[in-house]
Regions:
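GST-like fold's C-terminal all-alpha helical module
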Residues: 2-3, 104-203
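GST-like domain detector, emphasizing the conserved glutathione-binding G-site
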Residues: 1-138
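Terminal-tail/helix-coil boundary detector
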Residues: 210-215
Length: 215
């Protein structure tokens, strides 16, 4: 795909979970893209010029060499996988493609989404960005707990979420579980398979938390 438009700029906030997922993907691929870091508190991603360029405030946002753009985490990763097929992270066989997508979706809807609702409606840092409803926070803790049970059951049967090797599904799940810390939610102690899986990945360079450079 040498004639395909190439990435020229990634607008991101590397401390946030969705940008972290793309960053992890890039590190696993050994690919570097120039980054423009945004502080979410400044709301620079709501600037009219940004919205006109990308069509949404969602981060990360990828600009390509022909001027076209991509947003949404998995869309960006799928494009990058097509440009850089190895190491494969999104599926090498039809069944693996399906399983990785299946677990990506389960993690997003059963862990990442409810954790985001808990965070947005309970964390003091979000009070200036969200009309907080405490009942929303408490309600979403229940599906979040169920999502953790689903992941635990899978990891008791498989070394990784989508099978016998590390894939994008594991990147998504690891970062989703790490994001839960801001909601004061932890993986239960009796979820031994999940805790062992987390420990096995904890030193992986791609999964380290981003530390902003000192001012």
């Amino acid at each position: 795909l040498t004639d395909a438009p190439q990435p020229v700029r990634l607008v991101t906030c590397s401390t946030a979970p969705n940008p972290r997922r793309v960053n992890a993907f890039l590190i696993e691929k050994g690919v570097e893209i120039p980054k423009e870091e945004i502080d979410l508190a400044t709301r620079a991603h709501y600037d009219p010029a940004h919205l006109d360029k990308f069509g949404t405030h969602h981060l990360p946002a990828l600009e390509l060499s022909d001027g076209s753009t991509l947003t949404e985490t998995m869309a960006i990763c799928r494009y990058l996988e097509a440009l850089h097929p190895e190491p494969n992270l999104m599926g090498a066989t039809p069944l693996e493609l399906g399983r990785i997508d299946q677990w990506n979706r389960r993690v997003e809807f059963m862990i990442m989404l409810p954790a985001a609702y808990v965070f947005r409606h309970s964390h003091p840092a979000m009070a200036t960005l969200e009309v907080q409803e405490p009942v929303m926070s408490e309600w979403h803790r229940r599906p979040l707990a169920k999502g953790l049970e689903v992941v635990e059951a899978r990891l008791r049967a498989s070394p990784f979420l989508a099978g016998d090797r590390f894939t994008m599904a594991d990147i998504n799940a690891y970062i989703a579980l790490d994001f839960m810390r801001v909601t004061k939610t932890r993986v239960p102690e009796d979820h031994t398979a999940t805790l062992a899986w987390q420990a096995s990945l904890a030193d992986r360079p791609s999964l380290q938390r981003y530390v902003p450079p000192a001012a």
